Swiss-Prot record:
Family recorded in the similarity comment: Belongs to the GLI C2H2-type zinc-finger protein family.
Main subcellular localisation: cytoplasm
Localization, UniProt: Cytoplasm; Nucleus
Segments of skewed composition (Low complexity): 461-473, 1134-1143
Matching InterPro entries: GLI-like, Znf-C2H2_ZIC1-5/GLI1-3-like, Znf_C2H2_sf, Znf_C2H2_type
A GO MF term: RNA polymerase II cis-regulatory region sequence-specific DNA binding
C2H2-type Zn finger ranges: 250-275, 316-340, 346-371, 377-402
Protein's name in the database: Zinc finger protein GLI1
GO cellular component term, pick one: nucleus
Location of the region described as Interaction with DNA in the Swiss-Prot/TrEMBL record: 298-306, 360-365, 390-396
PROSITE patterns listed in its UniProt record: ZINC_FINGER_C2H2_1, ZINC_FINGER_C2H2_2
Length: 1360
């Protein structure tokens, strides 16, 4: 037949135009088709046959095909068939004019599957009708709907069905879904041919018997046993061959109807027109003795198909010549047609098995026999225990053994029981259960029989055995497709398919397969479901993406930290995140700002938010928190204080952002996503952090940032964060350290990839402040007591910029550089500890620090930013201009809190200072803060400096002014530290209270200050001194206060920092040391002053001397009463209590006095600046190693040339000589601001004077009081440094500091040229160093810079 039908190739070409191209592709290209068991006929033949019979089947009158049929059907029989085709009364194919839609509507069974296209391929599987032949996946399903004779010259594209199926078979699983649909359809199709639509649409309980039990895989479609075919009453579905042998009924047995007809067709017509349609919406079979027992069908077509059982109508005839097969269900016909076409849409679902079958039943048989030993299809007839591997065999069994009436109806399938149970039980259980249920349902068989079980479960849960077959790893998409060729519920998705994985658990599924076969299918499906459930459940527990608990703080917590606060491994990052926050941090993780991980990592993290365990990163890593915005979603984590409260674990987004930013900067990675409010947060959050209760937090405030962007060990005795007790030990997962965890040294966090801020000198409170401050600073390592503090300037600046300032900055919304904000925050905390307003007042000094930083940075920008901060932070605080220098006492108290402020200052270190390398300032912030307090006068100095027009300092105008004042203090004796402060240990800074008072006194003596400033202006300050423009804006009182305040703040022991016993001891030690140094210097002071005055920098020397005299006079004033011209423990310990006025007067009068003022800061011997100091990075590491290197500011200044170097805490070793061991910022720079504009930093850079005998380079020959106020206190928030430093281990290397200031601190404030201009000092510290080693006094330059910047800042703040 095939040979006869084989059309010439031309036919294929002509008949099969591009539409068939796909089909051709499938058929022609898939050699598997033949191999798969296609008819020996070539594809084209088969196709033609399919099309021909298809055409016949679809439309008897091939009118629509006629035009094409001649060409299309190469075989002569094609037209013959068309003409011969007998129109079935009800058959949708009966009328050629009927399109698929019509057929679907008219023939309940025939095309329902097509309509629903549950089995898109099933529709294709119909062979000639292959609506879905081309699997829906191929997109032909709809196209194939054109199978209707009208579909085109092709009639229905048999090729399509064949193609799709063949394609499926040939390609194996590629067409799986179509196949599964096909397979469902096929399984259904044969029985469907009898009751096709009825079985499909209805659950075909009765009709389902007809329907294929076919493979369990064909979930919804094939097997009534499976419940899919509940509606399929036809056992004949068995392979489509076993439709019930209907009696050729011609008499109507409808209730109350006894009509008789001559032909079956008439009977069918009668039933359809009189009874079924008469039933209207009630689709109940009233046929006498109907097993449905009046149970209604869901749809009319189901009833129509059902009635075929009674009438024996088989409208669906095989169109192939010589084949007389007819089926009551179209789907059965389609399945049958596959035998002619060789189409095998049902592919074995077992992995690795490519066998394809024309019907689902065969596939189920194959799968169950070959790939498993299961016999899921159990005969449910009571007393029968037969089991079969496939539904067709079961149907055969039932039909032959139990009789044609023993339809595999619901009673046989045991749908009710099986449905509920099979999904839950293993296939074996299902089998047993299926049997039991079969029995149970057998008892209820009558009702069950008529009952439509398919749609409920079969469609849902019952995949075809193939679809769900245990052997198949997956249901073929087709299998999963609910193809009820029978037309039952085709849309229902079989629960068993993987696509239905979600449904598997829920699906009692296989139970609905009411037959033993169905139960067998259920077993298989249950196996599959079990597997799937395991997969599902396992995934739910294992495979499912689960977010591991992120809250663990432990090592796992590290992972969770990554996950949660990802960027921040709690333990490893200095930042600790609460365990709970980890989970919350999943949300925050989205924020890449905080994460230490790269954004890429963050991305993975985000994707892996599920994966709570992210690689742990050491908190010590500077950039650990780079990616995450905020590790903790916890509001507390976000809240500055809350974050701080929890310790680092609660880093705020800003803090985390900074950490990440630093990390990114360090790693060169992209900057973290800025927080929406990050910039303000920089100041605000930091400030909040600094101001938060964490002031006492374990984090030693700002880690010093080195220009090298690396954490450098302070020379000797420096404690690395990891080295700090518990600092390195704590893992990211470890609980966040509380403020009390002072011992825990935070690892240095890179901020902005600039430099690691080393927590060096900052007080532990500073650390806590830093921690409280959060931000990247919060990540800064906490050095228990860094032997080597960061540069004084850094500390000073940090102190200067206190949380209060930061807060004000936040409040005022100033846009400040991150550095500025950080410093301000740091300082603000210190100032908060001391007096927020003082800080504000001190703000200019902060700016001075900033100026130092600016000196370091060579930017007045920072000063301006600081000014902004100051304005923001302090303008509100009070006396931004005035700086409440008289509040220096408060400042002193404040400096008690200054350590906290230092800590805060340390926190700000992370900001842009990294780039400038001024991060050292944060460490020095306490000193700087002291300077701030002294800086109020310093601000006055700035104001005076503002009067100075030195263009060079214009950038750093405020800082220059500051620096000028400070330089006036520092230049002579000490190298100008970055902050223009000699960074003295916090203890030294404790003495700044008296200078603060002096500042107030300075404020009281504006004229003197003015005079001094005037001299200062005349003195060759660095161009920063020239930047006196700010000074004009700076309140002279501020400048005065600044001058006094600096010394006060530096000197006031109690106020600056919280007086912890250790800190007190340190302060006392420092004070004693400073006093002793000062005493030495006072002893040497006269000649030092003489040297200073006489030595190079004559201009400055004279000016300084004059200033010193003036300053002495000024300091002699009540303002300066606290300053003692001669060093005395009292002076150092309580500068205010010192007879500083007289001493200052003396100092003013004599260079010695000036050099020796409390303002004068002891400096390390004036040896040549160590290279390490010259290079802040290396020197910072070595700072502790050598006095010169001791000054963290040395390195920091190196890192940021503009940075005001803060002298490290003065240690007794510094006492070697006044010149070498101590730098006194006697500062010619007395800022007597009779008027802000007039104030000129008289602080002569006179290295001679500054040297105070060349040894006391740090001293300004200007009034010792003033210098005490400015240089000592303002230049060095030494308290922090002292706090940070281990006083016992720390050697104060003022020379190093000054040297550092020389290069970095002096950058613009006191240019080496200016110092060089001083005959005495070839370098800034030359005077100092001339005594020990001539070194230009960078401190003076920085001081000038600071003063200038302070003046500018004050001006700015005033404008604010």
């Amino acid at each position: 037949m095939a040979s006869r039908q084989c059309p010439p190739a031309a036919v294929f070409n002509s008949m099969n135009p591009p539409v068939n191209s796909y089909v051709e592709h499938c058929y022609l290209r898939s050699p598997n088709v033949m191999a798969e068991g296609m008819n020996e006929m070539p594809y084209c033949h088969q196709t033609n046959l399919m099309t021909s019979h298809h055409g016949f089947g679809l439309a008897q009158g091939s009118d629509h095909l006629a035009g094409t049929d001649g060409s299309r059907f190469s075989t002569p029989r094609s037209t013959m068939k068309l003409s011969k085709k007998r129109a079935m009364s009800i058959s949708p194919l009966s009328d050629a004019s009927i399109d698929l839609q019509t057929m679907i509507r008219t023939s309940p069974n025939s095309l329902v599957a097509f309509i629903n296209s549950r089995c898109s391929s099933a529709s294709g599987s119909y062979g000639h009708l292959s609506i879905g032949t081309i699997s829906p996946s191929l997109g032909y399903q709809n196209c194939l709907n054109h199978q209707r004779p009208q579909a085109g010259p092709y009639g229905s594209n048999p090729l399509m069905p064949y193609n799709s199926h063949e394609h499926l078979s040939s390609r194996g699983m590629s067409m799986l879904q179509p196949r599964s649909s096909v397979k469902h359809c096929q399984l259904k199709s044969e029985p469907l041919s009898i009751t096709g639509l009825d079985t499909i649409g209805s659950k075909r309980l009765e009709d389902g018997s007809e329907g294929d039990i076919s493979s369990p895989a064909s979930v919804g479609t094939q097997d009534p046993l499976l419940g899919l075919l509940d509606g399929r009453d036809d056992l004949e579905k068995d392979d489509g061959k076993h439709e019930p042998e209907t009696v050729y009924e011609t008499n109507c047995h409808w209730e109350s109807c006894t009509k008789e007809f001559d032909t079956q067709e008439h009977l069918v017509h009668h039933i359809n027109n009189e009874h079924i349609h008469g039933e209207k919406k009630e689709f109940v079979c009233h046929w006498q003795d109907c097993s449905r027992e009046l149970r209604p069908f869901k749809a009319q077509y189901m009833l129509v198909v059902h009635m075929r059982r009674h009438t024996g109508e088989k409208p669906h005839k095989c169109t192939f010549e010589g084949c007389n097969k007819a089926y009551s269900r179209l789907e059965n016909l389609k399945t049958h047609l596959r035998s002619h076409t060789g189409e095998k849409p049902y592919v074995c679902e077992h992995e690795g098995c490519n066998k394809a079958f024309s019907n689902a039943s065969d596939r189920a048989k194959h799968q169950n026999r070959t790939h498993s030993n299961e016999k899921p299809y159990v005969c449910k007839i009571p007393g029968c225990t037969k089991r079969y591997t496939d539904p067709s065999s079961l149907r055969k069994h039932v039909k032959t053994v139990h009789g044609p009436e023993a339809h595999i109806t619901k009673k046989h399938r045991g749908d009710g029981m099986l449905r509920a149970q099979p999904g839950h039980e293993g296939p074996g259980n299902q089998n047993v259960k299926g049997e039991n249920q079969l029995d149970m349902e057998a008892s209820s068989a009558c009702k069950e029989d008529g009952r439509l079980a398919v749609p409920d479960i079969t469609l849902k849960s019952q995949p075809s055995p193939g679809g769900q077959s245990s052997c198949s790893s997956e249901r073929s998409p087709l299998g999963s497709t609910n193809n009820n060729d029978s037309g039952v519920e085709m849309n229902a998705n079989t629960g068993g398919s993987f696509e239905d994985l979600t449904n598997l658990d829920d699906i009692p599924s296989v139970d609905s397969m009411g037959t033993a076969g169905a139960s067998a299918l259920r077993k298989l499906e249950n196996l599959r479901i079990d597997k799937l459930n395991q997969l599902r459940k396992t995934p739910s527990s294992g495979k499912m993406v689960k977010l591991p608990s992120i809250h663990n703080s432990g090592p796992q917590g590290d992972m969770s930290v990554v996950c949660g606060p990802l960027g921040m491994s709690h333990n490893q990052h200095g930042i600790e995140l609460p365990a709970s926050s980890h989970v919350n941090h999943l949300n925050d993780r989205r924020n890449s700002t905080t994460s230490t991980m790269s954004s890429a990592y963050t991305v993975s993290r985000r994707s892996s938010v599920v994966s709570p365990y992210l690689p742990n990163q050491r908190a010590g890593d500077s950039g650990n928190m780079v990616d995450s915005y905020d590790i903790s979603t916890d509001p507390s984590g976000h809240s500055n204080e809350a974050v701080c409260a929890s310790g680092l674990p609660g880093l705020t987004p800003a803090q985390q952002y900074r950490l990440k930013a630093k990390y990114a900067a360090a790693t060169g990675g992209p900057p973290p996503t800025p927080l929406p409010n990050m910039e303000r947060m920089n100041t605000n959050n930091r400030m909040a952090f600094a101001s938060s209760d964490y002031r006492g937090s374990a984090i030693s405030s700002l880690q010093r940032r080195h220009s090298s962007n690396e954490y450098h060990n302070y020379g000797t005795g420096i404690i690395h964060p990891a080295q700090a007790p518990g600092a390195g030990i704590r893992r990211a997962s470890d609980p966040a350290r509380t403020g009390g965890d002072i011992q825990a040294v935070p690892k240095v966090q890179r901020f902005k990839s600039m430099t690691n801020m080393n927590v060096s000198m900052m007080g532990r409170q500073g650390t806590s402040i830093q921690q409280a401050y959060g931000g990247s600073d919060a990540n800064l390592q906490r050095h228990m007591f860094s032997p080597r503090p960061p540069s004084i300037t850094e500390n000073v600046f940090m102190e200067t910029a206190g949380p209060d300032e930061v807060c004000h900055t936040k409040e005022q919304g100033f846009i400040q550089s991150n550095e500025m904000q950080h410093y301000m925050n740091y300082q603000g905390q210190g100032s908060q500890l001391t007096a927020p307003n003082d800080h504000m007042n001190f703000n200019p000094q902060i700016h001075g620090l900033d100026g130092q930083s600016q000196n370091v940075y060579s930017h007045s920008q920072r000063a301006i930013s600081n000014m902004h901060l100051n304005a923001e932070n302090y303008s509100g605080q009070s006396n931004v201009s005035n700086f409440n220098q008289c509040q220096m006492t408060a400042h002193n108290q404040h400096f008690q809190n200054t350590r906290q402020a230092y800590n805060c200052a340390n926190l700000p270190v992370q900001w842009n200072e990294v780039s400038s390398g001024t991060m050292d300032n944060p460490v020095q912030r306490p000193n700087h803060q002291i300077m701030h307090q002294n800086m109020s006068p310093g601000n006055h100095c700035q104001s005076q400096l503002s009067n100075c027009t030195v263009p060079e300092s214009t950038k750093q105008g405020c800082p220059v002014n500051r620096n000028s004042c400070q330089q006036g203090m520092y230049m002579n004796n000490q190298k100008y530290n970055h902050g223009g402060q000699v960074q003295v240990k916090p203890e030294q800074q404790f003495h700044h209270s008296a200078p603060a008072m002096m500042s107030c006194q300075n404020m009281k003596h504006p004229s003197r200050q003015e005079h001094h400033f005037t001299k200062t202006n005349t003195m060759p300050l660095s161009s920063e001194a020239t930047n006196c423009d700010y000074q004009g804006q700076q309140d002279s009182t501020q400048n005065s206060c600044f001058n006094v305040g600096l010394n006060l703040n530096l000197l006031s022991p109690p106020g600056r920092r919280s007086q912890t016993p250790i800190m007190q001891v340190k302060e006392i030690m420092v004070r004693n040391y400073v006093q002793s140094q000062q005493a030495l210097m006072w002893e040497q002071h006269p000649k030092s002053m003489a040297m200073m005055t006489n030595s190079g920098d004559d201009v400055d020397t004279r000016q300084n001397q004059h200033k010193n005299t003036l300053n002495a006079a000024v300091y002699m004033g009540p303002k300066y009463m606290n300053y003692q011209g001669k060093p005395s423990p009292n002076n150092l310990m309580s500068p205010s209590s010192q007879d500083s006025q007289s001493s200052h007067t003396k100092a003013m009068g004599s260079p010695s006095s000036q050099c020796y003022n409390f303002d004068m800061m002891p400096h390390p011997p004036c040896g040549p600046k160590p290279l390490s100091r010259q290079h802040s990075v290396s020197s910072q590491s070595t700072y502790m190693g050598s006095p010169n290197q001791l000054s963290p500011s040395y390195q920091s200044s190196e890192s940021s040339p503009r940075r005001m170097a803060c002298l490290p805490p003065i240690q007794p070793q510094s006492e070697v000589t006044n010149n070498t061991s101590m730098m006194y910022y006697t500062g010619q720079m007395e800022m007597h601001q009779s008027k802000p504009g007039v104030h000129k930093l008289t602080t002569p850079l006179n290295l001679n004077q500054t040297s105070c005998d060349g040894h006391q380079h740090g001293q300004y020959n200007a009034s010792h009081s003033f210098l005490k106020t400015v240089p000592y206190t303002s230049s060095c928030p030494a308290a922090n440094t002292l706090d940070s430093l281990d006083l016992e281990n720390t050697q104060i290397d003022f020379t190093a500091i000054i040297d550092d200031a020389d290069n970095a601190l002096m950058p613009g404030n006191i240019s080496p040229n200016v110092l060089a201009g001083s005959s005495q000092a070839s370098s800034h510290l030359t005077t100092l160093r001339n005594t020990g080693a001539v070194v230009p006094n960078m401190v003076v330059g920085d001081l000038n810079s600071m003063l200038s910047s302070l003046a500018g800042e004050n001006k700015y703040l005033n404008t604010m």
